Amino acid sequence: MPRVKGGTVTRKRRKKMIKLAKGYYGSKHTLFKVANQQVMKSLLYAFRDRRQKKRDFRKLWITRINAAARMNGLSYSRLMHGLKLAGIEVNRKMLADLAVHDEKAFAELATVAKNNLK
């Protein structure tokens, strides 16, 4: 039986990895072995950070809401509890957007929350 070296398959596989490593610094975009390791690590980072991004944005929204709530004499937790008691269902993303772009509307929501806490 003749020996099969698989040259075209190997070349195609390596070329694909080098293509994925385009834009990487130094030997990471030219040498297959290093590029392969970096691409694998990059894919892991991408997978992990797609989930991390959701947590990061939630943290950011909560920080913004808390800052705006404290400007209106409430803490974040009391604001959220007051809104829940008032039956106002506004998600954190929208509340943070209001806190940044429409301070009057946020102040009205804070007033409603304050009144429902008593």
UniProtKB/Swiss-Prot annotation:
The keyword Ribonucleoprotein applies. The keyword rRNA-binding applies. GO terms for molecular function: rRNA binding; structural constituent of ribosome. InterPro entries: Ribosomal_bL20, RIBOSOMAL_L20_CS, Ribosomal_protein_bL20_C. Gene3D superfamilies: 6.10.160.10, Ribosomal protein L20. It comes from the Bacteria. Keywords: Ribonucleoprotein, Ribosomal protein, RNA-binding, rRNA-binding. One of its GO terms (cellular component) is ribosome. GO terms for biological process: ribosomal large subunit assembly; translation. Pfam families: Ribosomal_L20 (PF00453). Belongs to the bacterial ribosomal protein bL20 family. NCBIfam families: rplT_bact. Binds directly to 23S ribosomal RNA and is necessary for the in vitro assembly process of the 50S ribosomal subunit. It is not involved in the protein synthesizing functions of that subunit. This is Large ribosomal subunit protein bL20. The lineage of its organism: Bacteria, Bacillati, Bacillota, Bacilli, Bacillales. The gene is rplT.
